[in-house]
Design a protein with these regions (language model features):
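Basic, amphipathic N-terminal segments that precede the first structured/catalytic domain
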Residues: 3-13
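ATP/Mg2+ or Mg2+-diphosphate-binding catalytic cores
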Residues: 6-8, 292-322
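An alpha-helical support segment within catalytic cores of ATP-dependent transferases
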Residues: 13-29, 131-137, 144-218, 266-269, ...
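Short beta-strand segments
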Residues: 58-59, 96-97, 155-159, 216-219, ...
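Active-site Asp-x-Gly
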Residues: 214-217, 222-282
């Protein structure tokens, strides 16, 4: 993905502007070093270092019209989720200051603590399989810790007042948002695929509704949001995509490579998946790759053939299941 296209979407600030935000929160801005961090598809992120004391600043986009609907106006939710993670001793940043007033910045921003470590995605290919297996086991344990938080109602942070009777309604709404976003930019998903997706959801309504745990679920613990240190998980970053939903919406259940790590399953404590669970996982895989395709189209990042090939594979897999 071209970096300049991503930069055009993100709400980047000058060093002087960041110093003003920092001073407003911490009372001074002496001797700070500001580093723009890469990665992510939504927010601009900076590392601010004051004589070795590091904090991270995240700034939401000022124009969210090019974001998929489910990702709009959710930095407030990340702040709330980081507060919640503190109560379960989760390796996440601690929220330090959240501001959505618009006084110093036209969009919401969040200061949080810094977690040492290197990006797992960027270093995974250099790790031995045994280390990767151990990390995936840890990811399972951590994902399960979040999902231990239960609730009786579904919740989508971008639509906090929306009510859902069951998982079929919840998942169908997510797909409807995506498909409407796709239609708004005349996205070509292939012959009849708009209708096929809706038919798949209807066909598997019973499987979608056969859920045992409605829990807080981190839908975006993918390798790019994982930090490692000394071959262990040191932290998870990005907490805007947590929903109260089916626990199988946790990302590592439905990674887009079409596989579910056995070590993740062991760490999560769910080694056996019944047929309905396998079907839901495939539906969630389809959702994730469709989300990536629509996101790239909305932001004019380009068309990536591998995404469309993956999407076609997900469609074929779901139409073959009996």
């Amino acid at each position: 993905m071209e970096k300049d296209k991503i930069s055009n979407f993100k709400n980047y600030k000058s060093d002087d502007q960041i110093k003003q935000l920092y001073k407003n929160v911490f009372g001074h801005n002496n001797n700070i070093i500001i580093t723009k961090l890469s990665g992510g598809m939504k927010n601009s992120v900076y590392l601010v270092d004051e004589s070795g004391k590091k904090v991270v600043l995240k700034i939401a986009p000022k124009d969210e019209s090019k974001m998929i609907s489910a990702d709009r106006n959710i930095l407030w939710w990340e702040n709330e989720m980081l507060k919640l993670m503190e109560t379960i001793n989760f390796p996440s940043p601690n929220p330090l200051h959240y501001d959505e007033s618009g006084n110093l910045c036209e969009s919401p921003y969040l200061f949080m603590s810094y977690i040492p470590g290197v990006n797992y995605l960027e270093n995974k290919n250099s790790l031995d399989n045994s280390i990767i297996n151990n990390i995936e086991y840890e990811i399972g344990e951590l994902s399960s810790r979040i999902s231990s938080i239960r609730k009786e109602a579904f919740f989508l942070p971008s639509y906090p007042k929306k009510k859902f009777k069951n998982n079929y309604e919840f998942v169908t709404f997510l797909f409807e948002l995506l498909l409407n976003d796709a239609l708004s930019v005349n996205l070509d998903l292939g012959k009849d695929n708009y209708k096929i997706i809706k038919d798949i959801l209807i066909n598997y309504k019973n499987s979608l509704n056969n859920i045992s745990n409605l829990s807080l679920t981190h839908t975006d613990i993918w390798d790019g949001n994982i930090l490692i240190n000394n071959n262990r998980v040191s932290g998870i970053v990005d907490f805007s995509d947590l929903y109260y939903c089916d626990e199988l919406m946790c990302f590592y259940f439905h990674t887009i490579d079409g596989k579910t790590s056995e070590y993740f399953l062991k760490g999560y404590g769910k080694c056996n998946l019944n047929k309905d669970e396998q079907i839901r996982i495939e539906i969630y895989r389809m959702y994730v790759i469709l989300k990536m395709i629509v996101d790239c189209k909305l932001k004019n990042y380009g068309r990536f053939a591998w995404m469309y090939d993956n999407f076609d594979t997900r469609i074929k897999t779901l139409t073959k299941i009996r």
